[in-house]
Curated annotation (Swiss-Prot):
Organism encoding this protein: Meleagris gallopavo (Wild turkey)
Example of a GO biological process term: phospholipase C-activating G protein-coupled receptor signaling pathway
Residue numbers with lipid attached (S-palmitoyl cysteine): 9-10
Reaction it catalyzes: GTP + H2O = GDP + phosphate + H(+)
Protein name: Guanine nucleotide-binding protein subunit alpha-11
Spans annotated as G5 motif: 329-334
Stated role: Guanine nucleotide-binding proteins (G proteins) function as transducers downstream of G protein-coupled receptors (GPCRs) in numerous signaling cascades. The alpha chain contains the guanine nucleotide binding site and alternates between an active, GTP-bound state and an inactive, GDP-bound state. Signaling by an activated GPCR promotes GDP release and GTP binding. The alpha subunit has a low GTPase activity that converts bound GTP to GDP, thereby terminating the signal. Both GDP release and GTP hydrolysis are modulated by numerous regulatory proteins.
Domain of life from the UniProt record: Eukaryota
Length: 359
């Protein structure tokens, strides 16, 4: 064999190998594209206590295996701790707001509850049960509860404190609603994947408090949709981290930052205006115009208030071509979330199919 023919032979082998590698790469790219279409990443964003973790719990109930008896048992201690935390917050606020107890015995009850180390609470027994019940029924504590926007109190405080008898029964097992209302601040990142119509939806919940947000950065790749939660009821509340900053202003600032991030240029944005039930209660006595003077709608009108808040957020979008999809929600209401997420899923799938030129 001549040198030329040997070289030609080697060359054709190299070309073959190169073609094979190229074909492999093309195949892998097609597979990646198909797999990317099969797994959609949904990033749940919003400030602290906007309802992100509750939303994930609902996905587990609606699209996952829900909560077994064993799972619910795991929440018992957390329900007890939420009760003590709520009452301790109100006892501290009684002093700060200089509100007096109506019944003398409640001074001693307050001392008893205040000295409890919440982290160590594992049970809910006497004398704590009657102390908390008696305190909750004190007109002073009720006045303090009505002024809760002036300090930090969990949204589920009234839900649990009004049901102390049931929760204190021996062998108590938390209900699904008890589980949905448990407040545990999210630290770090929680992922919840679920399968829908042969597509994996990977929902990622990141902590909303300021200290948690710096951990978000690596979640930003390949995000199909941003699901941004706003608590409608926060228009008159201040931040956990800073008691002279309005929570809704903080939420607006975060939303503005998120929708202008270059990472999210190709991600759809879905805005959940959450806690609509709390807004309906609160709007009757706390006027939106006192916190947002530009509001010129009627007072005590939840519909006008929520439309104004929606417009405030949508107006932050600088890109007229980018549609912001919005829904009013109540994250603790399973049927409401089932209905809303069905619409959201259709939106996400349609947009995703468009991106892959499949429609």
């Amino acid at each position: 064999m001549t040198l030329e023919s040997m070289m030609a032979c080697c060359l054709s082998d190299e070309v073959k190998e190169s073609k094979r590698i190229n074909a492999e790469i093309e195949k892998q790219l097609r597979r990646d594209k198909r797999d990317a279409r099969r797994e959609l990443k949904l990033l749940l964003l919003g400030t602290g206590e906007s309802g992100k973790s509750t939303f994930i719990k609902q996905m587990r109930i609606i699209h996952g295996s829900g909560y077994s008896e064993e799972d619910k048992k795991g929440f018992t201690k957390l329900v007890y701790q939420n009760i003590f935390t709520a009452m301790q917050s109100m006892i501290r606020a009684m002093e700060t707001l200089k509100i007096l107890y109506k019944y003398e015995q409640n001074k001693a009850n307050a001392v008893l509850i205040r000295e409890v180390d919440v982290e160590k609470v594992m049970t809910f027994e006497q004398p704590y049960v009657s102390a908390i019940k008696t305190l909750w029924n004190d007109p002073g504590i009720q006045e303090c509860y009505d002024r809760r926007r002036e300090y930090q109190l969990s949204d589920s405080a009234k839900y649990y404190l009004s049901d102390v008898d049931r929760i204190a029964t021996p062998g108590y097992l938390p209900t699904q609603q008890d589980v949905l209302r448990v407040r545990v601040p999210t630290t770090g990142i929680i992922e919840y994947p679920f399968d829908l119509e042969n597509i994996i939806f990977r929902m990622v919940d990141v902590g909303g408090q300021r200290s948690e947000r710096r951990k978000w950065i690596h979640c930003f790749e390949n995000v199909t949709s941003i699901m941004f939660l706003v608590a409608l009821s926060e228009y008159d509340q201040v931040l956990v981290e800073s008691d002279n900053e309005n929570r809704m202003e903080e939420s607006k600032a975060l939303f503005r930052t998120i929708i202008t991030y270059p990472w999210f240029q190709n991600s759809s944005v879905i805005l959940f205006l959450n806690k609509k039930d709390l807004l309906e209660d609160k709007i009757l006595y706390s006027h939106l115009v006192d916190y947002f003077p530009e509001f010129d709608g009627p007072q005590r009108d939840a519909q006008a208030a929520r439309e104004f808040i929606l417009k405030m957020f949508v107006d932050l979008n600088p890109d007229s071509d980018k549609i912001i999809y919005s829904h009013f929600t109540c994250a603790t209401d399973t049927e409401n979330i089932r209905f809303v997420f069905a619409a959201v899923k259709d939106t996400i799938l349609q947009l995703n199919l468009k991106e892959y030129n499949l429609v």
